[in-house]
Regions:
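Structured secondary-structure scaffolds
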Residues: 1-47, 99-103, 150-220
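Short, glycine- and charge-enriched coil/turn segments that flank and shape catalytic ligand pockets
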Residues: 1-2, 63, 138-147, 180-182
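N-terminal Rossmann-like or analogous alpha/beta NTP/dinucleotide-binding catalytic cores
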Residues: 1-118
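Cys/His-rich short segments
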Residues: 114-171, 175
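Short, charged low-complexity intrinsically disordered segments located at boundaries
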Residues: 105-115, 135-143, 201-211
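Short, glycine/charge-rich beta-strand/loop segments that flank catalytic centers
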Residues: 91-102, 120-133, 191-192
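Short, solvent-exposed loop/turn and secondary-structure capping segments
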Residues: 20, 57, 137-139, 217
Length: 220
């Protein structure tokens, strides 16, 4: 049986130049990739840039540039970083590439066909910088402004029509998988934390946005 090993860095958000944190994450992933190759694994080591979202759109406008041009310039700096650090990555993915668009559209259509995506309305506290929604118990007030209690980032109340991924339907399947594959969650010290989180019930996930245009269009 082939021994395959896949590892990825976070695909970095190019709203600014690379910094020490990006270098740290990349080097850690590179160490794992090199070690697994020595052990005889077929390694696929990925890194890249996540180039869509409201934050990118706003930063591009702030710099008076088209979002794609803005991303082209900054993504190159992240790609150059892989050479400066002598990383052994096998691929560098950009979410603005046609191959990524094609993969997203294919996955979306499969999920629609299987009934795992549905259209509904969403309302909640949204952080542009975190690109995440927060529940009301995850919000606090500071100096008269609402912020995320988790990240400290400002949040705004948002209401919009959205497609949702039916994550709630996968709770039992995930719990069974964790039980049958005891080494799946590493380090093992985190296993109870993950299991307890899933046992509480997973919420369906909003997977589309109408509040900005810089993203992959929802397939028709």
């Amino acid at each position: 049986m082939d021994k395959n090993f896949y590892i990825t860095t976070p695909i970095y958000y190019p709203s600014g130049k690379p910094h020490m944190g990006h270098a740290y994450s990349s080097i850690v992933a590179d160490i794992f990739a090199r070690f697994k190759r020595v052990e005889g694994y077929n390694v696929l080591f990925l890194t890249g840039t996540d180039e869509h979202g409201l934050k990118i759109q706003r930063e591009a406008k702030k710099n008076k540039k088209d979002p794609k041009i803005f991303c082209d310039e900054l993504s190159k700096k992240f790609k150059d970083l892989t050479k400066i650090l002598n990383l052994s990555n096998d691929d560098f993915i950009r979410t603005t590439e046609p191959r990524h668009y094609k993969s997203v559209e294919e996955l979306w259509n499969r999920l629609v066909k299987s009934g795992d995506i549905y259209l509904d309305k969403y309302s909640g506290w949204y952080s542009v910088s975190d690109e995440a929604y927060y529940d009301k118990d995850e919000i606090k007030e500071l100096d008269g402004k609402k912020i995320s209690a988790i990240s400290g980032s400002p949040v705004d109340w948002v209401e919009e029509e959205s497609y949702f991924f039916r994550l709630s339907a996968w709770s039992e399947k995930l719990l069974k998988y964790y039980k049958d594959n005891k080494d799946f969650i590493l380090p093992s010290s985190r296993k109870n934390e993950v299991v307890n989180f899933v046992e509480k019930g997973l919420k369906d996930l909003s997977v589309s946005r109408t509040s900005f245009s810089w993203g992959i269009p929802v397939p028709k």
